[in-house]
């Protein structure tokens, strides 16, 4: 009787291993595959070119569309080597446009 129980147990364990390895018990989820893009395009913020008049400031030209820190940061990114507080009258600069 002990041999029969041992043989049945071994056969049952082997069946469980076979079933688990061949068929599996956890369903496989088909996850969508996304293709990675080789380059990510760096988009420059929208801008308009304006010729500065005497008395104009960056804030007076752009308006109050965003926070002053963001406006200054975007202006200086569009115009390298130019500080927002040092614009000159008669010169054309790129000013950020906000929706």
Swiss-Prot record:
It is a single-pass membrane protein. InterPro entries: LysM_dom, LysM_dom_sf. Keywords: Cell wall, Membrane, Secreted, Transmembrane, Transmembrane helix. It is found in: Secreted, Cell wall; Membrane. GO terms for cellular component: extracellular region; membrane. Residues 48-95 form the LysM domain. CDD domains: LysM. The chain crosses the membrane at residues 6-26. This is Uncharacterized protein YqfZ. It comes from Bacillus subtilis (strain 168).
């Amino acid at each position: 009787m002990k041999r029969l129980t041992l043989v049945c147990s071994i056969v049952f364990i082997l069946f469980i291993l076979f079933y688990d390895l061949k068929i599996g018990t956890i369903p496989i989820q088909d996850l969508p595959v996304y293709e990675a893009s080789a380059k990510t395009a760096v988009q420059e913020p929208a801008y308009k070119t304006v010729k500065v008049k005497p008395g104009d400031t960056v804030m007076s030209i752009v308006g109050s569309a965003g926070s002053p820190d963001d406006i200054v940061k975007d202006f200086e990114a569009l115009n390298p080597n130019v500080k927002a507080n040092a614009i000159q009258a008669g010169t054309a600069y790129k000013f950020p446009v906000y929706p």
